[in-house]
Amino acid sequence: MSTLAFLSPNGAEDVAVARSPMEGKAKAAGARFEVQGGWNVAVEYPGQDRVGQTAGFTDASHLRKLELQGDDVPGELGEAKREGDAWICQLTPTRALLLGGDHAAPPYAVDVTTCFAALTIFGPQAREVIARFCALDLRPQVAPPGSFRPGSIARQPGMIVVEDEQRFLLLFGWAVAEYVWTVVDDAARSLDGGPVGWGALQNNA
């Protein structure tokens, strides 16, 4: 099924708006949406200021994701290298993911944005939230900022980028996104956390 929804207000020219597979969950949680970069993005939730003091999570599925292939792909295994406002994460010696950013894509890049859904979990208890559904060792001395860890997330294949000491980007299959949201939401709420809008996340960057 296509991820694009078409809007035709007042008979105007059709505008394609891409939507996250977790949009339904976000709506049910009271999200307010704005169209940003062609995506319908959840930017605010009721009570999110309180949530951000413990552990918040936000839908980051709209981040651009490109797969780079070749004998000289950048990066090192196990590391996430910061390049401007993007991350480069090497999957194998010949494959890497470029996450985020708005620079021109290399001609050999494959757009895999809608192959991977994404959630960012942040806050003082972010590691504790993740530990409730993921066995990857994310202790600071083992996985400092700039680490890249493929593994199981909520019993699904996934990857984690350690963006900062209290901020983690989780990537997982588009098709299982609603299930992963439910698992993460349960874990966060058990610690008095919950969903946070994309705008608030940027303010905490």
Locate the predicted segments by residue.
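Basic, glycine/lysine-rich polyanion-binding surfaces/domains
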Residues: 1-205
